[in-house]
Amino acid sequence: MDGAVMEGPLFLQSQRFGTKRWRKTWAVLYPASPHGVARLEFFDHKGSSSGGGRGSSRRLDCKVIRLAECVSVAPVTVETPPEPGATAFRLDTAQRSHLLAADAPSSAAWVQTLCRNAFPKGSWTLAPTDNPPKLSALEMLENSLYSPTWEGSQFWVTVQRTEAAERCGLHGSYVLRVEAERLTLLTVGAQSQILEPLLSWPYTLLRRYGRDKVMFSFEAGRRCPSGPGTFTFQTAQGNDIFQAVETAIHRQKAQGKAGQGHDVLRADSHEGEVAEGKLPSPPGPQELLDSPPALYAEPLDSLRIAPCPSQDSLYSDPLDSTSAQAGEGVQRKKPLYWDLYEHAQQQLLKAKLTDPKEDPIYDEPEGLAPVPPQGLYDLPREPKDAWWCQARVKEEGYELPYNPATDDYAVPPPRSTKPLLAPKPQGPAFPEPGTATGSGIKSHNSALYSQVQKSGASGSWDCGLSRVGTDKTGVKSEGST
């Protein structure tokens, strides 16, 4: 079993359900040895670390802190200490930050012992608190241009897996440095030694940035060395990184505004020097127009159009204005609409003092404004031939009268249709007894043998048949001789 370098009571601050509270623990610091690594262990009470079985010790959620992962150990000031006279110190690792507290002498001893075991090869010293050394006769003045923005702004971060991080090959733990003009990502060696810079992102090329309780993230632009994309770093100091970046951006913005002010002053001074030197003014546009043409200014076969005098437009002057006389001498032509507002003010004053129904100044004179031609649909017309356009082919709706007694329409009862009987075949018609027979049947419309006649008094069985056959068909019957 390794021997402990230091042990004693320590207050550990924990946060659960949004509330922070101090919990008293028993801390034991073990140095690095062949049997184990340098570590700081926490227990509920004093007897938990010595002997006993494995089940006799009940440790907290934060069981062991490996000193190899320790980044910094520094005293801090807290608003609510766990007990009167206690001082706190912060122990930062690559994953999270721990806030510890003890009485003042024990807290200083803990910080010194932790630094000695966590940074054996580093150079660390504690600042003396009493009897500071007196300065020599040499006076020192602070430099107002010194900007310690990046000092103390190095944070241990762990790169989260994103598309941009995979494209740049970033994975694992790094150190993120917040500088005056950019964010720089530094690589870390095996012994937690900071190596050379790996990537940098200028503040002017960051689209947006933000933080969370456990991470810090920003979105890089297309012009960044890493290319566009979102980079997310897991850290417990996301709020500190966010504030440092925001402060650096505000300071850079203020410096940019100051630089713009210096540029304006330089431009003003340059203009003053030019004015004092009395440099010739550049030629005006009229001089350029009046200058003689060059030798090859126009092609040989080009035609020059003679300048024609400019004509005034129709409404260049108001109606009540008087044109200048030609014999008054040579005067420069006044610009167009030079007295427009003056006449308008006069007309407004005249309208207020006199009849308000006077015509406005910009009314067009008669005969000048063309009358627009009347279109086909200018005047509304009443529709005609409604009986033909709106006629209906058949009456719609109910055509039967309404019966209010039965609250229904007077529909007649359905009629029962009798089935039609099939026509009976017509048999031979027998004449009534006592009717005349013989040659009385000579109708050409009746068919042959349409009537059967009985024999007469002579008793001949084919009486009359031979005549009918002879008269009708011209063929002699069998009974004829």
Curated annotation (Swiss-Prot):
Signal peptide: none annotated. InterPro entries: Docking_Protein_DOK (IPR050996), Dok1/2/3_PTB (IPR037751), IRS_PTB (IPR002404), PH-like_dom_sf (IPR011993), PH_domain (IPR001849). One of its GO terms (biological process) is Ras protein signal transduction. The modification Phosphoserine is found at residues 48, 269, 291, 416, 460. The keyword tRNA-binding does not apply. Pfam families: IRS, PH. Residues 310-325, 436-458 have a biased composition (Polar residues). Keywords: Acetylation, Cytoplasm, Nucleus, Phosphoprotein. GO terms for cellular component: cytoplasm; cytosol; nucleus; perinuclear region of cytoplasm. The modification N-acetylmethionine is found at residue 1. Residues 270-293, 307-329, 404-481 are annotated as: Disordered. Expressed in pancreas, heart, leukocyte and spleen. Expressed in both resting and activated peripheral blood T-cells. Expressed in breast cancer. The modification Phosphotyrosine is found at residues 296, 337, 341, 362, 377, 398, 409, 449. DOK proteins are enzymatically inert adaptor or scaffolding proteins. They provide a docking platform for the assembly of multimolecular signaling complexes. DOK1 appears to be a negative regulator of the insulin signaling pathway. Modulates integrin activation by competing with talin for the same binding site on ITGB3. The PTB domain mediates receptor interaction. This is Docking protein 1.
